[in-house]
């Protein structure tokens, strides 16, 4: 009871502070809304909405079940995912946030995944899309196609490792599980339902992007004088992915560290992506409780892989190195590897204990 009162008091004070800030600084909120809607209109809707429609049609017309029947064994062996979840993993890798969550939710609604299988698949089938990685990061931020290729490959490898680390091997019954027979809808009905679902998902995404754009604006205003430019990508990216990635352009860190930050942000997604994903999961009756932990783990793996691979692809040649980069590499490199190793061991132990106790 005391804890509930304390939580209610904190929420009330937070709301009062939010109202006060909106009344005192309405221009910042208005600019954040304009920036968020511009991002939605110019980047998010053109890239996501058509893919939402196509991915919904892919599932509703039964192609997902056919592909899973033929290639589901590969997903079970490589990813330790149920065979029917393999198509959702591919949709998540190619469609961007939160297309994978939407695909998993639809598979769950159709009975092709159990609740436990869907909850785990939500956490590992949700990735940034290649259009954002190559177009925005590889083109606008790093201005080198190699950066986009490295980030995309690292994200895929980190996603596969996260799948394997957070799931136990499938039983023979799970490997052999097939989707229940579904009534085959005609194309017109499937198309109408696909567009409706895509529209609702796109609206949810844009709402969260706009809200977190406002929060990012207030964060810049509050911490602008005290937040170093090199810390801005992580601070802003923890709220909203695109804002954090855009801040990398003004960052003076060495290219390898900018790539490590970009890898972490891409795989983690930020609070905005997590909120979008939880909302999409809730539409299907799922909770998505494993999302934050799995995305943090994937971000740590992605940053560590980038740090290991960067010297091999000579990323320092992509742009001029900044002063002090060698010193920073010598001191911070072992620290990042140590933290990533600790995170890997912690989450592996945690999720295996949860699975053994049957609490997932």
Predicted features and spans:
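Short, amphipathic, aromatic/basic-enriched membrane-interface segments that mark the entry/exit
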Residues: 19, 59, 117-125, 181, ...
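Alpha-helical transmembrane segments in multi-pass membrane proteins
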Residues: 42, 47, 51, 55, ...
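Transmembrane helix-loop junctions at the membrane interface of multipass transporters and ion channels
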Residues: 27, 130-146, 311-318
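Transmembrane helical segments that form the transport core of multi-pass membrane transport proteins
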Residues: 61-63, 191, 195-266, 270
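C-terminal transmembrane helix pair
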Residues: 114-116, 131-132, 258-351
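Alpha-helical membrane segments and immediately flanking helix-loop junctions
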Residues: 78-142, 235-250, 260-284, 293-296
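Selected transmembrane alpha-helices and immediately adjacent juxtamembrane segments
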Residues: 13-26, 33, 37-45, 49-53, ...
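Membrane helical hairpin/interfacial module
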Residues: 42, 46-107
């Amino acid at each position: 009871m005391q804890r509930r009162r304390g939580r209610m008091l904190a929420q009330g004070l937070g709301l009062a502070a939010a109202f006060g800030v909106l009344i005192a600084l309405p221009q910042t909120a208005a600019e954040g809304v304009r920036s968020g809607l511009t991002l939605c209109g110019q980047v998010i809707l053109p890239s996501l909405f058509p893919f939402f429609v196509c991915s919904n049609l892919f599932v509703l017309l039964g192609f997902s079940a056919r592909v899973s029947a033929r290639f589901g064994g590969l997903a079970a062996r490589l990813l330790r995912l149920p065979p029917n979840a393999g198509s959702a993993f591919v949709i998540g890798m190619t469609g961007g946030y939160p297309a994978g969550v939407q695909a998993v939710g639809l598979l769950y609604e159709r009975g092709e995944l159990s609740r436990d299988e869907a909850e785990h698949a939500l956490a590992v089938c949700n990735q940034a899309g290649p259009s954002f990685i190559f177009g925005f990061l590889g083109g606008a931020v790093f201005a080198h196609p190699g950066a986009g290729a490295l980030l995309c490959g690292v994200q895929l490898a980190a996603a596969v490792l996260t799948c394997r680390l957070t799931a136990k091997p499938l039983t023979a019954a799970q490997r052999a599980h097939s989707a229940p027979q579904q009534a085959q809808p005609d194309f017109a009905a499937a198309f109408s339902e696909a567009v409706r679902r895509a529209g609702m998902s796109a609206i949810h995404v844009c709402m969260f992007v706009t809200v977190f754009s406002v929060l990012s604006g207030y964060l810049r205003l509050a911490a602008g004088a005290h937040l170093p430019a090199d810390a801005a990508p992580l601070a802003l990216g923890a709220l909203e992915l695109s804002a954090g990635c855009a801040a990398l352009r003004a960052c003076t860190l060495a290219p390898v560290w900018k790539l490590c930050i970009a890898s972490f942000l891409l795989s983690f997604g930020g609070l905005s992506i997590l909120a979008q994903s939880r909302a999409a999961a809730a539409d299907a009756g799922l909770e998505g409780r494993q999302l934050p932990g799995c995305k943090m783990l994937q971000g740590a793996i992605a940053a560590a892989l980038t740090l290991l691979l960067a010297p091999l692809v000579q990323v320092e040649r992509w742009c001029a190195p900044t002063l002090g980069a060698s010193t920073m590499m010598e001191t911070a490199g072992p620290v990042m590897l140590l933290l990533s190793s600790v995170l890997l061991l912690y989450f592996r132990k945690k999720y295996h204990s949860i699975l053994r106790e049957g609490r997932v």
